[in-house]
Amino acid sequence: MCQNIFQKIIKGIIPSKIIYQDKEITAFHDINPIAPIHILVVPNLLIKSLNEINENNKHILGNMLYISIKIAKKFKIDKNGYRLIINCNQHGRQEIQHLHLHLLGGKKLNKI
């Protein structure tokens, strides 16, 4: 079975700066950061996009958000603020077909 880059990072096949991992969620530094702090929070289970969330796996979104808050506090960006982004499919500019959340912070971010 062909694995995407996130699956390889989750399984330790590709080295990465993993900052959090449990049985459901893995978080690691983005290799092409667009902010001083740019962390990807991904489910360990392959969910290709936000559109694949359903009754059976919807709890994963809550876990992704909760872990993001914990990471923001760990990196001390919770007070000044941070941004969470989920891109969905081609027009949403999702590049890897594995649901992931971008945690951005460490400076005042541009308006969107």
From Swiss-Prot:
Q: Which InterPro entries match?
A: Histidine_triad_CS (IPR019808), Histidine_triad_HIT (IPR001310), HIT-like (IPR011146), HIT-like_sf (IPR036265)
PROSITE patterns for this protein? HIT_1, HIT_2
**What GO molecular function annotation could you give as one example from this UniProt entry?**
catalytic activity
Q: Where is the HIT domain?
A: 5-112
Motif Histidine triad motif: which residue numbers? 98-102
Please report the name of this protein according to its UniProt entry. Uncharacterized HIT-like protein bbp_327
